[in-house]
Amino acid sequence: MQVKEVMTSNIAALAPNNTILDAAKSMQAHNIGCMPVCNPDGKVAGILTDRDIVVRSLANNGDPKTTLVKDVMTKNVITAQPDMDISTALELLATNKIRRLPVVKNDTLVGILAIGDLATRHIFLNDAGQALSEISEPSRPANMTQ
């Protein structure tokens, strides 16, 4: 099975010069916690999660009205291709400890593959579960008081 058979197509993307307030509103409108960031030519410039907004901006007193997506997004994004085998994509997810792969064709965003897509479709459920367990590490809050 190939990535194109499972990926989500026609996805919303952010621009690098959007503010994180715009990004948060877009995430809320689409009920998602992660969005690819694309240049005007459609090439993937990065990926932004709701956690990036909180940890890389708000927790550092960043102003959501002026902080730009490009300043807090993850750059050098690992991507998949539509014709890639699902097992190869799972390996990329697990090896790189990530949960989502933007899917590109000719360097242009065409979709996104999330580990949840595989699990909810019962595709390679054991492999997806294994990959998820490899990328998920127990969270240990730092200096948490009761």
Task: Place the predicted regions along the sequence by residue.
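The conserved cystathionine-beta-synthase
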Residues: 13-31, 38, 80-97, 104
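Tandem CBS (Bateman) regulatory domains
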Residues: 1-10, 49-79, 85-94, 114-146
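A glycine-centered beta-loop-beta connector
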Residues: 27-30, 35-51, 93, 101-116
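N-terminal first-folded block
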Residues: 8, 12-36, 44, 48-49, ...
